[in-house]
Amino acid sequence: MLILAFESSAKAASVALCRDGELLSEYTQCTTLTHSRTLLPMGEDMLKNAELTLNDVDLIAVAHGPGSFTGIRIGVSMVKGLAWALDKPCVGVSTLEAMAWHGLSAGGLVCPVMDARRSQVYNALFSIENGRPVRLTEDRPISLDDLAQELGSYDWPAFLAGDGAEMSYDYLTKKGVDCVLAPENLRMQSAWGVAMAARDKEPGTADSLLPVYLRLSQAERERLERLEREAAEKKE
């Protein structure tokens, strides 16, 4: 199976091409350009250099969240459009599950962390069993205090990956948590991880592909807070 995978949940844009679990090509770009300008041209260029076309692709995969609200919307919308136009199956995978594939060489406990702001990280925990990540928790926003307490119950050191890894490492080590910071080449999100995670997912259609945000955006939170204030003022 030839999988074309996209990752746009954070600052870097990443595109990968995998056939039956083997990485054929991966492009990553981390610039000031928006994902809406870089993601699709990267994919088209990569396919061209591999002497392939979009019609050769069997499955289109994308990291559907959690992560940057804007980045996720761009990636999911683009893949929905491609899948619809080409009549191809597509699938969304957890950004955190995709990152867990970076911990294969470390083994033990893999702890992807993304900076969720508001004193929280997006996180899930995985163990490495038989050469693949096995989920231990659901994706969730969690405070570093709560994460430190949870990691303390495991016998393995936690392998930290993701754009929140360095921040989390500094905090967790001060709390006495046994953890390892992923090397820079394994720390950031990658489309290779998306492709690997997609192999076990049930393919869907463009209509079934949806973003996963885990919590409201800042604009939605502010709107809800404003409505609550207005409702309280009316009661007075």
Model-identified regions with their sequence ranges:
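N-terminal beta-alpha supersecondary unit
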Residues: M1-P66, P141
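Acyltransferase
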Residues: V180-E236
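Residues at secondary-structure transition points
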Residues: C30-T38, F69, R73, S77, ...
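DPxDG-like acidic metal-binding loop motif
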Residues: A61-C90, T95
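Conserved hydrophobic/aromatic positions in well-ordered beta-strands
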Residues: A16, Y122-F126, V212
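Stable alpha-helical structural segments in soluble proteins, enriched in small hydrophobic residues
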Residues: M46-A50, A85, G103, A191-E202
